[in-house]
Amino acid sequence: MYVEERVYTVLPGKGGEYLKNYEEIGMKAQLRHLPHMVGYYFTEVGQLNLIVHQWAYDDLNQRDKCRAAMTADPDWQAYLVKNRPLIVSQESRLMKCAPFFVERLKKMLAAGK
């Protein structure tokens, strides 16, 4: 299993607008296509203006297919038009689960459904 972590730095004072746009438009589109939302966060201490979210995938092939479908979704494209101007920078990490954590993550994801 893999977990992708995405970190977006948004313009100072724009975190609330970013999250509102995501909740109203982006989240519905993502949840239609991406299999497992692990978490969605914003920073309060340390480096500020960060939005962090994590998504789990069974394998890289699943990730590629899901992201391609999401990218083609008109609702996702409409969301990007609203939120891209708020983003200063973006990072992405693709992490492979440690062997002993795979089953635990699967149970956590199943419990959250």
Which ranges hold each PLM region?
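Short, structured motif recognition centered on aromatic/hydrophobic residues
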Residues: Y2-R6, Y18, Q30, L50-Q54
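Short amphipathic alpha-helical segments
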Residues: K14-G39
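Short, flexible helix/strand-to-coil boundary loops that buttress conserved ligand/catalytic motifs
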Residues: Y22, R67, L80
